[in-house]
């Protein structure tokens, strides 16, 4: 008579007669003793699912700086000139966003909606600077992405989830910090749907990208490849919950004012004087932007619906450009003045010269961005010569230096001072 072979636990080696229960699997067995042992280990070690949930819950446990809207705006004022309406609106939106995170941290029953921000306005009006300044004030990780480089999954280009990777890198791979950071996506208007019937051709960098951005902007757990690039099987991922990340997107939205003017023209019959005035005033028109205008421009309704704060950054005036040159904490004239002071040379800008620089920047139609280029071109040769010339005491930039390309006025030191 053949003796029956006893089944044994594949983990501890106990036979079926030495244990109370032995559970069979494909070619393996596990006893009740080992099950209890493994259960105890799992109770002490968070599972991947638990870690995924806990990241968003534990993120706010680190110090969270929540300033009042007035405090936020006051800090922005130190770096950003003009844009009073935009700064007030964004200050409130950011305050509510981080108040929402704090409410989640305190397990409050009432939850607040997410305060993502859409900034409209011409190039050089301060959209990016506002976002950068916010991140600096709040001491949170910050990254900038260019919407024109993004493509939907399956096409050559950059996956939208790589934006989250950049934020994670800015946070030194601290997931908890990254999950309450700020992402600014520039040139968002460039992914507007360009045709009314998108089924004719595949819009790789338009509607498809808007669809791809929807989930991470609204809030999802994104699987991020640590080294970026495309995803592939058997790859390790870092899970980042985007629910508490503040998304700010910006774009020039060229000709959006015409779409708004057309709508106002249809709805303000009998008020032609007011309408005609608005048509000639782009900033006033953009201040009246509605969701339907952005949809007509080419943004899909689902995407626009993710932004409950839409605000216009107005084109900078001549006086504001001059103020940008001299007033902010990091004003560019202050920077160059300090550079020359390190060479023991005094750099002087006459008021008329500052206005001439501002006028030149305005003509370039790139707003404040042109100011730095104008000054760099103006002072480059001087910065090359001055370190080797101890005879120069001061340099004066006059209006003619800008308008007629005349050389700056250079004042020499006295021989006694050089000696």
Curated annotation (Swiss-Prot):
Please name the source species.
Answer: Chlamydia muridarum (strain MoPn / Nigg)
Enumerate the residues binding ATP.
Answer: 122-129
Q: Which GO terms describe its molecular function?
A: ATP binding; ATP hydrolysis activity; ATP-dependent protein folding chaperone; protein dimerization activity; unfolded protein binding; zinc ion binding
| A Pfam family annotated for this UniProt entry | ClpB_D2-small
List the SMART domains hit by this protein, alphabetically.
AAA (SM00382), ClpB_D2-small (SM01086), zf-C4_ClpX (SM00994)
Question: What are the recorded Gene Ontology BP terms?
Answer: cell division; proteolysis involved in protein catabolic process
Q: How does it assemble?
A: Component of the ClpX-ClpP complex. Forms a hexameric ring that, in the presence of ATP, binds to fourteen ClpP subunits assembled into a disk-like structure with a central cavity, resembling the structure of eukaryotic proteasomes.
Its domain of life? Answer: Bacteria
PROSITE patterns tied to this protein: CLPX_ZB
Keywords (alphabetical) are: ATP-binding, Chaperone, Metal-binding, Nucleotide-binding, Zinc
Gene3D superfamilies in the record: 1.10.8.60, ClpX chaperone, C4-type zinc finger domain, P-loop containing nucleotide triphosphate hydrolases
Its family remark reads:
Belongs to the ClpX chaperone family.
* Positions annotated to bind Zn(2+): 9, 12, 31, 34
User: Single GO cellular component annotation?
Assistant: HslUV protease complex
Domain ClpX-type ZB, which positions?
A: 1-50
Described purpose of this protein according to its UniProt entry: ATP-dependent specificity component of the Clp protease. It directs the protease to specific substrates. Can perform chaperone functions in the absence of ClpP.
The portions of this protein that span the membrane are none
Q: Which NCBIfam families match?
A: clpX, PRK05342.1
Protein name per its UniProtKB record: ATP-dependent Clp protease ATP-binding subunit ClpX
């Amino acid at each position: 008579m053949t003796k029956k072979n006893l089944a044994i636990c594949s983990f501890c080696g106990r036979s079926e007669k030495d244990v109370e229960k032995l559970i069979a699997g494909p070619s393996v067995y596990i006893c009740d003793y080992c099950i209890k042992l493994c259960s105890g280990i799992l109770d002490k070690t968070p599972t991947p699912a638990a870690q995924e949930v806990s990241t968003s819950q534990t993120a706010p446990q680190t110090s969270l700086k929540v300033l009042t809207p007035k405090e936020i705006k006051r800090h922005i004022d130190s770096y950003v000139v003009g844009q009073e309406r935009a700064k007030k609106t964004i200050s409130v939106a950011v305050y509510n966003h981080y108040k929402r995170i704090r409410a989640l941290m305190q397990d409050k029953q009432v939850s607040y909606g997410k305060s993502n921000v859409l900034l409209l306005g011409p190039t050089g009006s301060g959209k990016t600077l506002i976002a950068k300044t916010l991140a600096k004030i709040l001491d949170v990780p910050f990254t900038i992405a260019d919407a024109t480089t993004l493509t939907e999954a399956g096409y050559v280009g950059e996956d939208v989830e790589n934006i989250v990777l950049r934020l994670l890198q800015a946070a030194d791979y601290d997931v908890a910090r990254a999950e309450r950071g700020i992402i600014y996506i520039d040139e968002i208007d460039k992914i507007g749907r360009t045709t009314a019937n998108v089924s004719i051709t595949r819009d790789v960098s338009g509607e498809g990208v808007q669809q791809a951005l929807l989930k991470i902007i609204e809030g999802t757990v994104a699987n991020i490849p640590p080294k970026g690039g495309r995803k592939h099987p058997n790859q390790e991922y870092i899970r980042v919950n985007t629910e508490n990340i503040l998304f700010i997107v910006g774009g020039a939205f060229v000709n959006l004012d015409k779409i708004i003017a057309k709508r106002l023209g249809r709805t303000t019959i009998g008020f032609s004087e007011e309408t005609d005035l608005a048509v000639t005033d782009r900033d006033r028109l953009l201040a009246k932007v509605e969701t339907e205008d952005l949809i007509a421009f080419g943004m899909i309704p689902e995407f626009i619906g993710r932004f409950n704060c839409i605000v216009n950054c107005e084109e900078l005036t001549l006086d504001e450009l001059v103020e940008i040159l001299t007033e902010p904490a990091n004003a560019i004239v202050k920077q160059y003045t300090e550079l020359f002071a390190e060479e023991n040379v005094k750099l002087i800008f006459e008021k008329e010269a500052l206005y001439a620089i501002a006028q030149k920047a305005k003509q370039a139609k790139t707003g404040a961005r042109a100011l730095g280029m104008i000054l760099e071109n103006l002072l480059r040769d001087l910065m090359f010569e001055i370190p080797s010339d101890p005879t120069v005491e001061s340099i004066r930039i006059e209006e003619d230096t800008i308008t007629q390309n005349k050389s700056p006025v250079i004042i020499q030191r006295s021989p006694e001072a050089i000696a």
